[in-house]
Amino acid sequence: MRILTRAGAALAGASLLAASAGLGPAQAIVGGYQVEDGDLAFMASIQTAGSEGTDGHFCGGSVVSSEWVLTAAHCMEDTKPSEIQVVVGRTNLDDTSGGQTLTADRIEVHPDYADTQTFDAALIHVTTPIESPAIELVPLGEESLEEDGAALTVSGWGTEFFGSPFIPAQMKAVDVEAVADENCTTNALMGFQAESEICAETLGGDSCQGDSGGPLFGSLADGRLVQVGIVSYGLGCATPKFPGVYGEVNNPSIHDFITSTVG
């Protein structure tokens, strides 16, 4: 059963926020810390077309090439490219003096998402080259960052507590730890799928509504920063014993979908 996504406000009449009540999508970052201007430059804000500041923000994303932004499939359900814009290079969404506001001309959703509600990954193609740097995907088969207790970070502009109607302008991040599949059994009632999803948590910290589609990332032994997950869903936000759930970038089908689409 999939009723737990962490998308933010409604888009084009689709009430994503209403769907996030109780068991629902990930909201803003709970706990954590504010991100300094210029840091995490691969972050993207997915917004309603024509909006300004935080008004239209409903999901996060990550720059994965000069033309493509990775986000969650549930963020793009029943959505046309003309209905959205992508903001990059802006840590504070109210500071419009920097960064880029980009139009989209193509949305690709993982082909298996509609049937399963898993494989929660989508890609947005923008019409203008992205100036911000891309984040590298975790190499296929590299599982060190999915081991129990591995240090990870999730970031975004989601709400700061479950049910809040307010999107913060300043990006936040929270450091979390990976939860091994065998230790994420409490999420079984939400339909957790170990083959295509991963879990992460920390006491008092989590992603939340408005963070859906944003990246879960960490550093490999050689120091490279890589994306290992896509914010997907959870039971409320920072609910004890119920880790946040993320689309698994290391899943062969998700990894191939991203790399074959981006080229």
Where do the protein language model's features map onto the residues?
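Secretory targeting and sorting signals
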Residues: 1-28
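C-terminal subregion of chymotrypsin/trypsin-like serine protease catalytic domains
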Residues: 2-6, 23, 44, 62-76, ...
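N-terminal activation segment of mature serine protease catalytic domains
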Residues: 27-51
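Conserved catalytic-core segment of clan PA serine endopeptidases
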Residues: 30-38, 85-132, 143
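A conserved glycine-rich beta-strand in the N-terminal activation segment of trypsin-fold
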Residues: 43, 49-66
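Acidic glycine-/aspartate-rich tracts in secreted/extracellular proteins
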Residues: 49-51, 74-78, 89-94, 112, ...
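Beta-propeller and closely related beta-sheet repeat lectin domains
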Residues: 59-62, 206, 213-215
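Chymotrypsin/trypsin-fold serine protease catalytic domain
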Residues: 100-101, 117-203, 251-258
